[in-house]
C-alpha cells in the first residue's frame, strides 16, 4: 500500500522507464561536480588547463611548421658548401687523370657504391669485384682514394680506402646482428630455445678448424699492394733447366722482345721468389726457419728481387721474368707479385716424350721427371693460369700471347693519361747512360743509381695496406720520407744490368738479345738423324739437337686440342675482337722464323 502510494506520487507513470535525467537533472551537473574535485587554488580546473594547453600546442605547431628566414638561409648555405666541395672534388679528379700511378692494389673484397656511402661526387665511385686490380693515383681524404679499375675503357674515380671499407663492413655486420636479434624475439624462436632448455639439449659448437677459418677470414685486408704492372712468368711445358722447356720459352722471349720493343723489360731472376710469401716476410719468427733450411736463396736475396720487380713495374712497362725456380703457379699464389702466368701446354704426353728423346741421351735420362712435371701442370684448373698456349705453331702461340698483352697494355694505359711517365723516362735514360757491363754471373749484386740507398725492407714486406693501421688512409708513395714505402726516390732505377738488352753468352739471358740464336733456327743434329718430318740437317753444332717439326706422326692425337676456345682477356672491354684461328700443322711453327713478316 505504501509502495503503491509512493509510486503514484511520482511524476511519471509506472509503465514508463525512469530516464537518467531524474538522477542528473542538468547535463552539466555531473561534470560540474567532478570539476569541483580537481579545482586548483586559482579557481581553474584541470580540464580548463588541458583544453588551453591543446590550443597553445596547436598554435605552436602551426607556427613552427612555417620555416623561418634563418632556417632557409642555413639550408642554402649548406647546399652551397656541398656544391663547392663537389666542384673541388671534380677538379681534383680531372687533374688526377694525368698523374702517374702511385701504387697498385689487388682487391680481396668487392664494392658496389650506394647513396649512403657519402661519395665526394655521387655517381663517380668505382665498382669492383674481388681479385680485381686498381691503379691508385692519389689520396683524396682518409675515406677515399682517387684511382681507376685496370680495365679498358675505365676512367678515374673515387675508391674507398681500407678505413672506409672497414667502417662499411662494421655497419653491415651491426645491421645483420640487429636483424638476427629481432628475428630471435619471435614466438617460434623463443619456444624452440625454451624447448632446448627444458629437454637439456645443447646446440653443437662449431669445430676448432671452422672457428680458425672464420677468424682468418675476418682479418683479411681489403687490399694487397702489388706491382703496378703484373709481371709475366712462363711455365711449362715441363721443368725449367731442361732443353725442351728452355727452348720453347726462349722462343717466346725472343718474340716478346721484338714485338714489344721499347715497351717491355725482360729480366732473369735466379733467386727463389716463391719464398716471398706475405706470411713469411711479415713474420720475423719464420725468417730463422727459412735461413736454416737448405734453400738456394736467402731471404735478403729474395727481398732484393721482389724490390727490384716492384721498381721495374713502376715505369708502367711490361715486365717479363725469366724465373729459374718457378715451375708451377701455386709457387707464387701467396706472394705479392700477382703475376700473369703463361702456360705453354703440350697436351699429348707422347709428343712431349718424342721431343725430349730428340734432344739426346742427356735429356732422355730425365724423361720421367719432365713427364711428371708436365702432368702436374696439366692437372691444374684453368683458373690458375691467365693464358694457356696450346697452339701447334709458334706463330699462333705468339699472336695469342700478344693479343692478351696488347689488351693489358691498353687497360693499364688509358687514353686520358697521355703525358709520358717520368719514371719511364728516367729509367730509359739511366739504361742508355750505363756502360756496357760485364756478364752478370750473380744477379743479386746491387747496382744502385747515383745517390740511391738500399731499402731496409723489401716491398714484399708491406704487401698489405692493412698492415699500417695508423696510416690506412694514406697510400704507399704518399708516405713521409722516413717511411719504407715513401722512399720513391731511394728505390733503384735499374738495379740489374741484365734488364735491358743483357747479353750473357751461354746463358738463358742470350734469348733476349740474339734472335738469330733462337730455337727457331735450330736444326737436327746429324748424329741423331732427321726425324719423320725434319728437314735435311747437317752442319749444326751438337748442342742444337732436334726440331719440333718431327712430330707429324702424332697429328691425330693433337686434333682434339685444336678446337680449344681461348679465354677472353680479362682486360678487354665488352665485345672484344675476334680470336685468331689455329693452324693444323702440329708444332711446325715452333721451328720456323716468326719475324719475317
Curated annotation (Swiss-Prot):
Regions of compositional bias (Polar residues) in chain numbering: 54-71
Assembly with partners or alone: Regulatory subunit of L-type calcium channels that consist of a pore-forming alpha subunit and auxiliary beta, gamma and delta subunits. Interacts with CACNA1A, CACNA1B, CACNA1C and CACNA1S. Component of a calcium channel complex consisting of a pore-forming alpha subunit (CACNA1S) and the ancillary subunits CACNB1 or CACNB2, CACNG1 and CACNA2D1. Interacts with CACNA1S. Identified in a complex with CACNA1C. Identified in a complex with the L-type calcium channel subunits CACNA1C, CACNA2D1, CACNB1 and one of the gamma subunits (CACNG4, CACNG6, CACNG7, or CACNG8).
Modified residues annotated as Phosphothreonine in this record: 499
UniProt xrefs under PANTHER family: VOLTAGE-DEPENDENT CALCIUM CHANNEL BETA SUBUNIT
Annotated gene: Cacnb1
Protein's name in the database: Voltage-dependent L-type calcium channel subunit beta-1
Ranges of compositional bias, category Acidic residues: 548-558
Comp. bias regions, Low complexity: 43-53, 182-193
Domain SH3: start-end pairs: 100-169
Any single biological process term in GO: calcium ion transmembrane transport
Residues where Phosphoserine is found: 44, 47, 73, 186, 193, 547
InterPro entries from the UniProt entry: CAB1-4_N_A-dom (IPR046937), GK/Ca_channel_bsu (IPR008145), P-loop_NTPase (IPR027417), SH3-like_dom_sf (IPR036028), SH3_domain (IPR001452), VDCC_L_b1su (IPR005443), VDCC_L_bsu (IPR000584)
Example GO molecular function: high voltage-gated calcium channel activity
Keywords, alphabetical: Calcium, Calcium channel, Calcium transport, Cell membrane, Ion channel, Ion transport, Membrane, Phosphoprotein, SH3 domain, Transport, Voltage-gated channel
Pfam families: Guanylate_kin (PF00625), VGCC_beta4Aa_N (PF12052)
